[in-house]
Amino acid sequence: MKEVPKEPKKLREGYTTGACATAATRAALLTLISGEVQDESTIYLPVGRFATFHLEECEYRTSSAVASIIKDAGDDPDATHGALIISEVSWCNGVDIIIDGGVGVGRVTKPGLPVPVGEAAINPVPRKMLKETAQQLLAEYNIQKGVKVVISVPEGEEMAKKTLNARLGILGGISILGTRGIVVPFSTAAYKASIVQAISVAKASNCEHVVITTGGRSEKYGMKQFPELPEEAFIQMGDFVGFTLKQCKKQGMKKVSLVGMMGKFSKVAQGVMMVHSKSAPIDFNFLAKAASESGASAELVEEIKGANTASQVGDLMTQSGHHQFFEKLCEYCCLSALKEVGDGIDVDTSLYTLKGDFLGQAVQHGN
């Protein structure tokens, strides 16, 4: 009997820090108003549906109330998965709703972010959710008082070390984020948003030259190559080469330096702008053509066509002394980048080995 293949398990969605903070705030304010401790909290998410959160803690105090929720990021656990998100709500003078961050919520120290310098790193959509939730409850109970909401994350400062917050100038903790309220497993939206934010910070720091890398290792090599540039100028693009280049052009960068290694940059050279391992295979015929243009023998060209990895091709060209091959590959990367974004920006590309040995560089000037 033929075995029926199992359907892949559907990945479970999670909730953003912004959604958790909002649900905790609703519970805390309801407790403050009614004097009754809550067990759970239901809110309406920006994505267009209701969600109910279990409360880890809910406490009524003399002049305030506190509620907390453990963030569940679903089947795509991020740096803040398992974070305890606490909201403390208290009455204040006037009728304003004041939103601030406490322990473990970062504070903005650099321009270029959607939150002004000096403010707690609670992004615009979560701020709106917090404010509207408080306004709705106050209206429901016909209360005309001011409310202060303080969001805290006890382990936030430690968790922030696994994020780009320090690079972006967000110090002291994590950011309260989320535009939809939910975390979609393995979504690229969050990573792309972080790229846009990093470029904005670079621009606000008066950087006109940025270095974009595929990860931490290539960034380290780039920092050694361009020691004159500030930390804000270095941006990890991951696999999103085309997207990052377009954002650099859109935000007015004058020069972009690509720094990376053979595997992913072999794809960029052949015109692939999304370099995930599953997005497109390495074209070894293309690498063989570049090798031939660099003076490689017919025998070596055939060996390259039968190679298994781009790193293997790099080793073959290094061992045979064809160092101009790497410059040729960098030249192709620059041409691919300019084809992607058009003129008006200068592009240079540098190639390194996994161990950090410099292989080659090329520059192309956009008209």
Swiss-Prot record:
What pathway is this protein said to act in by its record?
A: Cofactor biosynthesis; adenosylcobalamin biosynthesis; cob(II)yrinate a,c-diamide from sirohydrochlorin (anaerobic route): step 6/10
Tell me if S-adenosyl-L-methionine is a UniProt keyword of this record. yes
Which GO terms fall under biological process for this protein? anaerobic cobalamin biosynthetic process; methylation
Keyword Lyase assigned to the entry: answer is no
Catalysed reaction per UniProt?
Co-precorrin-5B + S-adenosyl-L-methionine = Co-precorrin-6A + S-adenosyl-L-homocysteine
Entry's transmembrane regions: none
Cystine pairings recorded for this chain: none
Q: Which UniProt keywords apply?
A: Cobalamin biosynthesis, Methyltransferase, S-adenosyl-L-methionine, Transferase
An example molecular function term from Gene Ontology annotations = cobalt-precorrin-5B C1-methyltransferase activity
The UniProt record lists the EC number as 2.1.1.195
Catalytic EC class: transferase
The record's InterPro entries line, in alphabetical order, gives:
CbiD, CbiD_sf
HAMAP family on file:
CbiD
Please state which protein family the record places this protein in: Belongs to the CbiD family.
- Can you name this protein? Cobalt-precorrin-5B C(1)-methyltransferase
Native source organism of the sequence: Priestia megaterium
